[in-house]
Amino acid sequence: MNKNCILMVAIEDELSKHSHKTYFEHTINSWQYYCDKHNIDFYVIRSKRPDVKYSVWHKEFVFDYVGDSYEKIGVVDFDTMIKWDAPNIFDLYDDEFCGVLDNVSIQWIDKSLKAFRSSFDELSDVPMTLSQYINGGVLFFHKSHKPFFEKLKNFYLTNKDKMDNWSIPGVGKEQSILNLFLVKEGIKRKTLPYCWNTVGMVKKGMLWHNDKLDDKTTFLFKYGYIWHFTGIPIQDRNNLINDVWNNINQFYK
């Protein structure tokens, strides 16, 4: 057993309208290579827990999967791929809770926070600024955060019926709850640079290159370590991840 680990939830959800299987193995392979390179244990969760309806809520059960022995832990979404030469993320923090700011859509964040604050009394008065709001798809933390995840897990289980039948569209499922709980519990945090989670890569132009200098290197490869293919229509996402992998898979051997 190594001292650090990364967990990915890669469940083909029967409740999803689209299949993600066409790129699962590519993203998994990139993370497996990275973890082997840096002596990190890698867990892939492929099946649902009987008491959890949606795959997205399995991240809150991270310590049920990895136990108490690891010093530092990461949880990453299945639509993330890590660059072959990315440095060891676990060398970049101590005992903080780490994530990348998510400021792709201020309107979406505002709507989401309002929806969850108004739906749960315990979150109604939790303050939150845009300089605090992180993306929930790439998280790194310490073993001391187990009690925090227990609170998230218990929040879901206590409000399971409401969460499983959530009826407010366009506000996400657990990301804003994560952020509100981080503030509510006074968790010490560290904001990671954008290169560690390229959320909103299309809007930010990460798929382009510097044509003025005739530099053909895509900004994604030039400036990103963890490529997050979210915010893209599912079929386009499938095609993009497959195309990216076909162009770079030789670096993961």
Predicted regions and their residues:
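Charged, low-complexity C-terminal accessory regions
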Residues: 63, 74, 79-95, 104, ...
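Short, solvent-exposed loop/turn segments at secondary-structure junctions
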Residues: 11-14, 49-50, 80-81, 103-106, ...
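GT-A fold catalytic core of metal-dependent nucleotide-sugar glycosyltransferases
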Residues: 55-114, 139-141, 145-149
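Short, flexible, basic/aromatic active-site loop/helix in glycosyltransferases
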Residues: 116-130, 147
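Catalytic core and acceptor-binding pocket of nucleotide-sugar-dependent glycosyltransferases
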Residues: 131-239
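N-terminal anchoring/stem segment of glycosyltransferases
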Residues: 1-71, 246, 250-253
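Short, solvent-exposed polar/charged micro-motifs at secondary-structure junctions
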Residues: 52-55, 108-111, 199-207
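Non-transmembrane alpha-helical segments in soluble domains
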Residues: 32, 90, 179-183
